[in-house]
């Protein structure tokens, strides 16, 4: 075909296209389409030309309802502010306070009591620290006893509370009878029985952060209240031991004397506490609907396993607990020895030293319990650990140059107690927000293991402070804290609050 012919054919095609494009387009309209057009027309007139005030209100309500349907909504946790019965919270916190009183009541007189029976300062530190090691050994049997299968995932907190009361009653009894028997190891056996009672340290932390009892928004607050109860216990215990020792210093009675009187008082307090919880403690258990949901949760095979990241998190939390309580218990065990050599303090004065410090720190811990409303757990940990490290570092410098006035030492000791108390408060709360609920019990146990080991080894090192040397002991505390602080900074991003 020639080019002219090809161009002619193209021109004819373009003319036909132009005629087609210029023709009007017709659509087949059905009755359904007409109904849609009428509906759109009515809605346009309704929204655009209202005639009455009632019509205006109707238009506004319709617009707001349509608008709200376009706004994305997110599920709200209705149980975020849930709390268990207040009377039960009170009993748990009282148990925490009394447990710490039983642990610390021997601090002012432990060294002199063991020396009167032929012991040493290191043995005195063992007497103070051995109970928490025993509590670690009895932790698993207590878990089995408090978490039967019939509880459907709930923990029966009443059981460990009663067991702890019995253990403390008999532990204090044997501790008191050691002087009459003139057998130093009866002191140790009595403190070991106290250790069975100290298994409740786990349940204090667990109750205040239990996902089945406490809402997410309340966990850090209750955990800090538990720390406050512990602080008050460490205040009341040494004060009680010191003041009663001074009141009975001239007693020649082999049963009721300066070494045993405080333990007798604690025995009577535990007996009264046990009778009270039997009648007034309110246990929270699963109802029928919760039993069904709990059974489904237990049968779920798709629950996430503990990842390596979460395993490292658990190790880190246990490390924080160990180092914080190692330093606190080491300092407390060394108070009567350290102040006795530097400032010639007796048992009464060293007990007042510890008690006054706790009394001053307690209001600040109470005020800090409200920080969880504005700060994340990691921020609270960062600030608390920093204060503790700062106090220990200054103490190391002043002790090395032998220029440590009593007032300065008191301030540094109080600052260290406050910092580490606040820094270790959110550990269980943080784990409950980071881990799947399946692993919450594991987190509580891991943290409690760190606390128990630190109480034992910290008390032994504190009792042997002059065998280690004061600079060596303080340097050990500072070095351990520096390591965990660097780990906290390294893990900062992964500790951001999250829920499951």
UniProtKB/Swiss-Prot annotation:
The modification Phosphoserine is found at residue 9. The chain crosses the membrane at residues 87-107, 126-146, 156-176, 183-203, 225-245, 261-281, 312-332, 351-371, 380-400, 408-428, 445-465, 471-491. It is a multi-pass membrane protein. Keywords: Golgi apparatus, Membrane, Phosphoprotein, Transmembrane, Transmembrane helix, Transport. It is found in: Golgi apparatus; Membrane. One of its GO terms (molecular function) is transmembrane transporter activity. It holds the Pfam family MFS_1. Signal peptide: none annotated. The keyword Magnesium does not apply. It comes from the Eukaryota. Residues 1-23 are annotated as: Disordered. Residues 1-13 have a biased composition (Low complexity). GO terms for cellular component: cell division site; cell tip; Golgi apparatus; membrane. Belongs to the major facilitator superfamily. This is Uncharacterized MFS-type transporter C330.07c. It comes from Schizosaccharomyces pombe (strain 972 / ATCC 24843) (Fission yeast). The lineage of its organism: Eukaryota, Fungi, Dikarya, Ascomycota, Taphrinomycotina.
């Amino acid at each position: 075909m020639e080019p002219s012919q090809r161009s002619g054919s193209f021109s004819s095609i373009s003319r036909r296209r132009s005629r087609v494009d210029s023709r009007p387009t017709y659509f087949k309209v059905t009755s359904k389409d007409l109904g849609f057009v009428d509906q759109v027309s009515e809605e346009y007139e309704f929204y655009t030309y209202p005639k009455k005030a009632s019509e205006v209100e109707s238009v506004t309500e319709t617009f707001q309802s349509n608008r709200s349907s376009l706004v994305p909504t997110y599920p709200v946790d209705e149980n975020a502010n849930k709390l268990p019965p207040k009377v039960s919270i009170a009993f748990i916190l009282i148990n925490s306070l009394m447990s710490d009183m039983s642990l610390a009541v021997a601090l002012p007189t432990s060294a002199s009591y063991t020396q009167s029976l032929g012991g040493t300062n290191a043995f005195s530190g063992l007497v103070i620290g051995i109970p928490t090691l025993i509590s670690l050994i009895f932790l698993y049997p207590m878990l089995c006893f408090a978490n039967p299968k019939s509880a459907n995932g709930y923990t029966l907190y009443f059981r460990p509370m009663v067991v702890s009361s019995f253990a403390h009653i008999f532990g204090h009894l044997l501790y008191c009878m050691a002087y009459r028997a003139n057998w130093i190891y009866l002191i140790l056996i009595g403190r070991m029985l106290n250790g069975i009672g100290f298994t409740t340290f786990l349940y204090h932390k667990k109750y205040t952060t239990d996902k089945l009892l406490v809402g997410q928004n309340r966990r850090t607050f209750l955990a800090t209240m538990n720390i406050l109860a512990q602080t008050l216990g460490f205040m009341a215990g040494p004060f009680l031991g010191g003041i009663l020792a001074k009141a009975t210093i001239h007693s020649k009675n082999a049963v009721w004397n300066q070494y045993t009187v405080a333990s007798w008082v604690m025995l009577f307090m535990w007996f009264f506490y046990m009778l009270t919880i039997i009648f007034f403690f309110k246990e929270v258990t699963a109802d029928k609907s919760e039993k069904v949901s709990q059974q489904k949760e237990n049968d779920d095979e798709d629950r996430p396993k503990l990842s390596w990241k979460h395993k490292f998190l658990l190790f880190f939390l246990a490390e924080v607990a160990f180092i914080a309580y190692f330093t606190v218990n080491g300092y407390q065990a060394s108070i009567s020895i350290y102040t006795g050599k530097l400032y010639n303090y007796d048992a009464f004065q060293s007990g007042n030293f510890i008690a006054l410090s706790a009394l001053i720190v307690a209001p600040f811990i109470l005020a800090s319990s409200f920080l969880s409303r504005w700060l994340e757990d990691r921020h609270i940990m960062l600030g608390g650990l920093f204060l503790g490290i700062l106090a220990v570092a200054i103490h190391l410098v002043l002790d090395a140059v032998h220029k440590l006035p009593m007032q300065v030492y008191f301030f540094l000791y109080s600052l260290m107690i406050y910092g580490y108390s606040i820094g270790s408060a959110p550990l269980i709360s943080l784990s409950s927000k980071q881990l799947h609920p399946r692993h919450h019990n594991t987190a509580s146990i891991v943290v409690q293991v760190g606390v128990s080991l630190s109480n034992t080894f910290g008390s032994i090192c504190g009792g042997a402070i002059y065998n280690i040397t004061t600079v060596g002991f303080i340097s050990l505390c500072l070095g351990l804290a520096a390591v965990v602080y660097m780990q906290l900074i390294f893990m900062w991003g992964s500790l951001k609050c999250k829920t499951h």
